């Protein structure tokens, strides 16, 4: 196996592990996970969580530091996440009642995941 292929495989499994840990942390806060790795033609959402009428669109980043996790979510990624969220929302029968929030969960080595509510807002990527 090539070095590049091995690195991609490790990153893939690290991402899955981080998403599982982030989902668990959100469930402990009372959220229900309604989708994992929700893919659309416009982008992918790592986690979609819901508590009542509040829906979290969650980007999960596994990095060595919190700062690295923050900078890993680029404006381009935010646009793709928002576009995918719009498609998801269109498919919800109760969409008129729902409030969307774009959060991030940073998964750091040997630490509990750090949940950042309202990491970005729709249309504001800076």
From Swiss-Prot:
It comes from the Bacteria. Gene3D superfamilies: 3.40.1350.10. InterPro entries: Restrct_endonuc-II-like, tRNA_endonuc-like_dom_sf, UPF0102_YraN-like. Pfam families: UPF0102 (PF02021). SUPFAM superfamilies: Restriction endonuclease-like. One of its GO terms (molecular function) is nucleic acid binding. NCBIfam families: PRK12497.1-5 (NF009151). HAMAP family: UPF0102. Belongs to the UPF0102 family. PANTHER family: UPF0102 PROTEIN YRAN (PTHR34039:SF1). This is UPF0102 protein BCAN_A0183.
